[in-house]
């Protein structure tokens, strides 16, 4: 399997450099145009060249027909080992819900159980862990809570090894939040912590609050596994925690997606999040739960939980899992692809898009590690053997499966960003439009063919209100920021999306 050396960015340039043509008086499309191009039926997942270097797939193409192609991209459950896949499929038929939520929740639970016992070495000195930050996005009744309950049933029912079980906490962020988490992580029996949120909007509001910066930095450190110092006097453990690990999982309704974005700008939170979005629920009659499959899921987690037995210290160092030569070749080509996309100066990447691309290789490593250990655990469960603590390697097939998952999450992230941006654009535009209408302002921009500097012309007594709205617009990064640098026009002299959006409706 050899990657093609195509270097095609034209479609992505179009998406990021052209302006929106939706006017204030027009109804928005039923679903925002999303950055995917091919239905799954037309995508050969087995050919790494198609998936790996097709930039239309990774970076998006505006679908002029208005159809939402992402509705045709389900979670690739074929990447799971056979019995685990059967558990996900039959459980979702029983629940009459899309498999997306349960599949994503299972990935997070596996990563939490593995915790800090194993790490994948992508390059010399570059280790990634199996923990994930994931958010299930859907309307009320779409099945977020049932999926969480099914994936976490072995934990809720205390069916894992009690001596080496990990913590599931519902604690909301407070002044002592960091202290509580790190104190739990420092305990000898703790492999990792799963921070579970049935509804994540409150959590995101707190960490994105200007007073919550410390909490957000703490979560970023716990995601990356960087050493953390505990110095507060009321904490039982004081000192340096070498490899703290935390996973994050919960649900968020579509109308609350705006809480994901910090008003001060993109800081990497969205790039660290993986989003599960439901597709069409399974058709046909519901079926009874299969106790054998449910027990298989328990055995899988027990097998993975036993990996913590061979770490054996209060602050265990992870055992490293290496890639074989085929996996290394694929990994290096994926790295080159994402580097080429990020470094192409002709592409006007927004800060959030840049964050997603920057974290793509890291997320690929995490998904690869999870699938590798999950497949190994299922083999051991079916053969009745103990999981091998040593000698596990990543093969080329597994990293390709992880790439399929990465693409699924990648597209979902762009979907979420598009919904946030579209809603924000619409809200700011209406506010500015109503302000100008109330104050008799007919022209607020001056331009020469959309190519010169855009600037507000103060024709009202309260110009500060207009300026404040512009500050809000720029803080959202709606086509005005590129790699953290403000610019008033995108490449080719075209106006930013928001500028044209209101310009066409205020003259």
For every predicted segment, state its role.
Residues 27, 34-507:
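Phosphate-handling catalytic cores of nucleic-acid transaction enzymes
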């Amino acid at each position: 399997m050899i990657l093609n050396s195509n270097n095609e960015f034209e479609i992505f340039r179009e998406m990021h450099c052209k302006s929106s043509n939706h006017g204030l008086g027009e109804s928005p499309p039923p679903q925002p145009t999303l950055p995917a191009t091919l239905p799954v039926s037309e995508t050969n997942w087995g050919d790494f060249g198609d998936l790996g270097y097709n930039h239309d797939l990774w970076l998006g193409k505006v679908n002029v027909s208005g159809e939402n192609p992402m509705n045709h991209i389900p979670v690739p459950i074929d990447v799971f080992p056979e019995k685990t896949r059967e558990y996900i499929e039959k459980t979702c038929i029983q629940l009459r819900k899309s498999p997306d939520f349960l599949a994503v929740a299972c990935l997070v639970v596996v990563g939490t159980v593995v915790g800090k016992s194993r790490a994948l070495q992508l390059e010399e000195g570059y280790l990634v862990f199996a923990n994930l930050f994931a958010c299930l996005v859907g309307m009320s009744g779409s099945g977020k809570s049932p999926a969480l309950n099914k994936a976490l049933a072995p934990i809720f029912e205390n069916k894992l090894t009690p001596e080496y079980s990990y913590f599931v906490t519902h604690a909301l962020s407070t002044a002592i939040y960091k202290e509580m988490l790190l104190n739990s992580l420092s305990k000898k029996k703790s492999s990792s912590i799963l921070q579970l949120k049935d509804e994540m909007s409150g959590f995101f509001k707190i960490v994105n609050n200007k007073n919550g910066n410390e909490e957000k930095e703490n979560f970023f450190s716990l995601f990356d596994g960087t050493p953390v110092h505990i110095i507060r006097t009321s904490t039982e453990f004081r000192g340096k925690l070498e490899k703290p690990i935390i996973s994050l999982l919960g649900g968020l309704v579509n109308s609350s997606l705006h809480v994901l974005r910090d008003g001060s700008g993109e800081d990497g939170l969205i790039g660290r999040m993986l989003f599960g979005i439901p597709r069409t629920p399974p058709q046909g009659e519901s079926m009874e739960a299969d106790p054998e499959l449910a027990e298989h899921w328990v055995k899988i987690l027990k097998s993975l939980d036993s990996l913590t037995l061979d770490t054996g210290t209060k602050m265990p160092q992870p055992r490293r899992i290496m890639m074989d030569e085929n996996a290394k070749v694929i990994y290096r080509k994926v790295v080159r692809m994402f580097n080429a996309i990020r470094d192409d100066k002709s592409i006007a990447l927004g800060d959030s898009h840049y964050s997603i691309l920057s974290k793509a290789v890291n997320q690929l490593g995490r998904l690869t590690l999870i699938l590798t250990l999950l497949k190994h655990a299922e083999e051991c469960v079916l053969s009745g053997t103990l999981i091998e603590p040593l000698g596990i390697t990543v093969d080329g097939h597994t990293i390709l499966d992880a790439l399929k998952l990465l693409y699924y999450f990648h597209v979902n992230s762009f979907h979420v960003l598009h919904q946030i941006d579209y809603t924000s654009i619409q809200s700011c535009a209406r506010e500015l439009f109503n302000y100008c209408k109330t104050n008799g302002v007919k022209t607020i921009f001056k331009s020469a063919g959309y190519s010169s500097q855009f600037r507000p012309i103060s024709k009202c007594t309260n110009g500060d209100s207009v300026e404040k709205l512009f500050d809000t617009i720029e803080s959202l990064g709606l086509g005005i920021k590129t790699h953290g640098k403000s610019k008033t026009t995108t490449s080719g002299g075209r106006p930013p999306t928001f500028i044209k959006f209101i310009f066409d409706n205020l003259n």
